[in-house]
């Protein structure tokens, strides 16, 4: 169980191991903070500055980056301070509740946003016309506000001691105090997080099945043109008969209106999804699934430790495993920019545009004017 008193449970003469462990924790968390703040700031500036990135997926990505950056700037310094002072909380109890609220808020916000993103990725591939028509800036803002509202609803009840927020000495942070499920109310929060992660992967699984079933294009079926007097018309007509009649080479009555040329407004507004757009949507889907998978991998050890505390009363969680799991959950705030720049060609192109020294040959030289003789 979590010890919240801040007193060491046992005193040993070998003080070198705790000091070395604290040094490693400080170095790793400092590195995570630097990478998270720099990477999320660069990615956010690119999305805000580049008009080509003003699309629904990048608005969601911007929200994730801002949340991770704020988490690194607000929550992690308190963890550094607690590690530096020997795994103890030197601030007030109210500040502990505020920091714990922020940590849980950003965790649930990432889970809710990743679920919403998975749904939009499925809509972008399976129902592209509806997605292109309905996924506007205001729709994205509504989705983001909904994710934040649900996150606040999940993180706010423990402020009133419903699943208490306390400083956990073994984790060096203020967070949920997970105890045996008969003595605490944190089981519902952990189940909600697990359901969200499972539902997100279920949506991506459905998207994968949809792409597998539609992996082959249907052959084009040519519809023959209709003619009683050599004035070909109908769905298969090319317009050559009408062109011949207008040019003076036709005989007989004027050909009727060609359905292949004149279309009503509803049919004209409908368009097929081009191959470049398909590749772009699939690329975004792979990038967001990689972010979701890393979220699952980095948070799973800590979630297992939480369930261990809730369901296993006799045996405590090993200290090394718990410390590793906590720092893996911290690392999740720094991985999103790395994944995005590795898997998204548009982001890499924009980054090279604003930082030519990172490109292969810098900015292209202007061509000399010439004229064709």
Swiss-Prot record:
Tissue expression from the record: Expressed in the ovary, specifically in granulosa cells of follicles that have passed the primary stage and in oocytes (at protein level). Expressed in preadipocytes.
Disulfide partners: 96-174
Gene Ontology cellular component terms for the protein in this record: plasma membrane
Transmembrane portions of the chain: 27-47, 60-80, 98-118, 140-160, 189-209, 288-308, 323-343
A biological-process GO annotation: negative regulation of neuron migration
Main location: membrane
Classification via Pfam families: 7tm_1 (PF00001)
Organism, scientific name: Mus musculus (Mouse)
InterPro entries attached to this UniProt entry: GPCR_Orphan/Phoenixin (IPR051509), GPCR_Rhodpsn (IPR000276), GPCR_Rhodpsn_7TM (IPR017452)
Official protein name in the record: Probable G-protein coupled receptor 173
Glycosylation sites: 3, 184
Localization annotation: Cell membrane
Lineage, broadest ranks: Eukaryota, Metazoa, Chordata, Craniata, Vertebrata
Protein function: Is a receptor for the SMIM20 derived peptides Phoenixin-14 and Phoenixin-20. It mediates the Phoenixin-14 and Phoenixin-20 augmentation of gonadotropin-releasing hormone (GNRH) signaling in the hypothalamus and pituitary gland. In the ovary, it mediates the effects of Phoenixin-14 and Phoenixin-20 induced granulosa cell proliferation during follicular growth.
